[in-house]
Structure formats: C-alpha cells, structure tokens
Amino acid sequence: MIAAVDVRKTFGDVTALDGVSVAVPAGTVHGLLGHNGAGKTTLVNVLTTLFVPTAGSATVAGLDVVRDAAQVRRRIGVTGQFASVDEDLTGTQNLVLLGRLLGASRREASQRAAELLELFGLAEAADRPAQGYSGGMRRRLDLASGLVGRPDVVFLDEPTTGLDPESRLGMWDVVRTLVAGGTTVLLTTQYLDEADRLADTITVLSQGQVVAAGTAAELKSRVGRRTVSATLAAVNIGPALDTLRRAGLDPLQSGRTLTAPVESSRALAVVVRALDDAGIEADELGLHEPTLDDVYLTLTGARP
C-alpha cells in the first residue's frame, strides 16, 4: 500500500533523507521512529506529495507520488502534529465543510460528519465551536477531518504530541479502530511505547537514514536477550550466586539483586525452583524483555 525506494531529499546542502526505503502492507500500522530532525516528517511530506523527492521513488495505493500526485491526495488522509481545524466553526461545521469541498452533497457530508463525530466520541460536542474543545478533542476532530473522504491510507505525524495520557490512550483506540476497518496507517512518533503498542512494523530513522526495520519483537531481539532478576532478602548473596551458577545461569550482582541473561521465559521457573530448593528467600523475582528504549539507544546512541 505504501512503498518508498531509495528516497533522497535535499534542501541545498542539507540532506534530510538519504536513501530511505519503507514498505507498508495494506491494513497495517507502520511506525516511523526517530528523534527530532531524523527525517520522519520529511518522509511523510514526500509520501503525501508535499515534497518532490530529489531521488528515488515512492508509491501510495499503487500511485506514484510525483506523476499521480492529484490522485494520491484523493486516496489519503493526513493529520499533523498540531490540530488544524477552524476554531470558529462547530465540530459538525468543520467536517461538513470538508465534505462539501471534496464534492459530497450536503446530505452526504452531514451524514459522514455525524458518523465521524460518533466514532471519535465528539457527538455531544458536535454543535459547540471548536475553540471550546480541549487539546485532545481538537486532535480527534483533526483526525476525523482527515477521514471525511474515506481514505485508504492515513498519515499520522506525531498525533499525540502534547496530549495528556488519557487523550493519548483515546487516540490509540481510534487508530486500532481504523486498522480494524481496513485502513493503512503510517504513524510517526517519538514515543517508544506508542510504537510498541500500535505498530505492526517499525522503521527507525537517524540522520535521514534507516538504521533498523522490522517488528518490535525483531528489533528487540537485535539488542539483547531476556533477563531474570532476583532481589534477595538476605545481604549475603554468595550462596545464591553459587545456586544459580549450578542451575546453568551466569548471574551478575548489583547490591542484593542478581541478574542473568536467559533464552526462554521458562528460566524464571528454574530460578524459583533453584532458590527454593536451596532455602534462599527472594523479596522480588522478575523476567525482563528488551524494550524499544534499549533498541533506540543501541542503534542511535540517543533517546528520541
């Protein structure tokens, strides 16, 4: 549904994208992860026909973003980092206006507006001016605006930036609803948990280049294994070290906590059984997976 091949974009002497390739199957969420200036928004602008690539090629819904730009625009919806709604108009008026501009009859536009306001939990505020909406409500109205034309592909450029936790969770639910209905979503974000929760596949950008791509699980597997940890009740951890080594583990000590890399989640049961057989009491036991934080720090040396 979305394909970028060796896309390069320069602005004078500045290279914003340097040979970026991305492939997004239909009906999935693809996350673009990267710090400010990594090239996320520039790539979105190329894919949405706002920028012409300096080199390389890209298609959206099978249409070339340069040759078929007008057709691409009719197949996509775009939501930026900041809500772009007319604050003097009501929620309904904003959506009806867009529907009419897209060629719908007044009846069709009104019906579509009502559907979207209900979907985004804005029905009760439909007749209120948007200037009275909260930040989360404006962002939802902005996303609804991008769906008036029933797009096949939706680009969400950092849609939850600046939102409170509750509003972020609400936006996540909306994205899941879109994908369940068959919409393809490309999501740019600086929030690692957002990419982990929503994206089927992820591309990590740094300085305009792709440094990694794959599912969250695949990316995590590249930077380290699972670990088990045991925080002991006793200060003397010598016996516990010996016990875990005899169980085939290679524990490291930090205070009263022992940590060991493991291949399988079943190792937690091995640790519990070994400590119990030795009569060693643990205050806390845990199994820890690598996180996207670990992935990003390993790949780029910085946090997004």
What is the role of each PLM region?
Residues 263-304:
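C-terminal coupling/interaction segments
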